[in-house]
Amino acid sequence: MFHRFRIGQAAATIVSDGPLVLPVAAKVFQGPDAAALNGALSATGQRTDAVDVQQNCLLIDTGGKRVLFDNGMGSSKLYGPDSGQLPASLAQAGVDPASIDALVLTHAHSDHCWGTMGDDGTPNFPNATIYIAQSELEFWESNPPGQRRERSVAGVKKHLSPLHDRITFIRDGEAFLPGIQAIDTPGHTPGHMVFLFDGDWCLTGDVAFHDPLSYAFPEAESVFDVDPRQGVETRRRLLDRLVTDRLRVIGYHHPWPGLGRVERAGRTYRFVPGDE
């Protein structure tokens, strides 16, 4: 599955790695009561016995470079049987993985980087330079304690550590590829990055990962955040910027294809889908 659009003058495509199924909202979002969370889901036609999200990977051709942002779950079915669709989506869009020059990672959680290596130990994107924050890679390679973190540590050792010679570290504020700037947004993970594009677009990664819950309850802490309090601070700061600067949004986990704008809704926010 793919969706073509434009980011400024650049050709862009959203390519799907398929849906994920997360636990019930009250187990993912801490703070609001279950009734409030479920009410927001029901109001947008979503079920309440689980949290459904997409994996919308951005592919953009800019400055003579073909760039892919994040790459899904690979062959893992950790969050449901229907992930792992990225290779088929790229093929449907007519994109050879070998033609991808750069692989940019918002962060190193399973659903963003486990498509980097094949099960046979060879890179799925054999000609791509990998861009990631140094603090992100170093955190996961330091073996941080915690049961939930063990999977991410193992994933980084499989998918990123063998490719150190292909990795380029990116810094806050750096325009590291033509028309693309990295912005440090820690909390979800220590080295989480979002990306600004010429043409007033922002790829937001997992700072506000769910529509509508991340917008209706920006103060809710996420069980997936390494530093939940910092995650809330970063989310509020980014959402304010998205509204103030009128930036269009590429939401990795938002309903397909994840494109739209953010508006204020009283003291909270709402996501408004659309390419324009």
Task: For every predicted segment, state its role.
Residues 79-80, 114-124, 261-262:
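Metal-dependent catalytic neighborhoods of phosphoester/phosphodiester hydrolases
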Residues 67-69, 104, 130, 201-203, ...:
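Residue-level marker for buried hydrophobic side chains located in beta-strands
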Residues 112, 181-194:
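Active-site glycine- and acidic-residue-rich loops that bind
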Residues 2-92, 194-207:
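Conserved beta-strand hairpin/beta-sheet module of binuclear metal-dependent hydrolase folds
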Residues 84-95, 99-111, 126-184, 230-246:
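Metallo-beta-lactamase
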Residues 17-19, 71-74, 108, 135-136, ...:
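Active-site metal-binding loops of divalent metal-dependent hydrolases
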Residues 80, 198-200, 204-276:
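Cap/insert and terminal regions of metallo-dependent hydrolase folds
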